[in-house]
Amino acid sequence: MVSAYSAKSIECHGYNIVRILDGRKKDVNVVINKESHIIVIPHIVKDNFKIYSKIYPVEIKNKTAIFYKAVHKNKDSEYYSDYSNSFTYKIGETKEEECADNKSGSCSRGIHIAHKSWAISFGSSWDNMALLECEVDIKDIVVCKDTDGKVRASKIKVIREIPKEEYYDFK
C-alpha cells in the first residue's frame, strides 16, 4: 500500500488495486485509459454526454452516437434483453422505452447501452450472448453521475449484430 498525498501521477506495474480519496476522504471516480494513465474525473462534469464521449470510446456521427447492447440470442436467432426476455430486438428496428431523466442512478428506467468493451464485459458470461450495434440520437441519452461506461436511452435503432471477430476491433 502506498500513500501518495497530492501526487500528480502514480506509476504501477503488474496487478494493482487503486483507491483514490479526495481531500474530504470521499472516493474519486477513476478511469484508466488505453495508455494506462490514471485520469481523475470530477463528479460535477461526469454526467453530460460531451464529457462522457471524451472519456469513453464512442463513435459520434452528426447528432447520433454508436453504442452497443449485450443481449441474449435464442436458437431461433431472436434477440432479447437480459432484464426481460419479453423485450426483444430486431435488426433495423427502432426500440422505444420510457427513460427516467434523473442522472443519479445508472440502473434507472431506460434502454441500457454502453461503449463496446463495457457491453462485451457485461454479457461475457452468457453462453448465448450477441452484441448489437445501435445508433442513438444524442438528445435521447441520459449519462448518470455514477456511470462506469453504461448510459440509458429512450430510443435506439438496432443497426446490426457484431460478429465475434469484431468484438475487440476498436477504431
Tell me the role of every PLM-derived stretch:
Residues 1-171:
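Short, glycine-biased loop/turn motifs at secondary-structure junctions and
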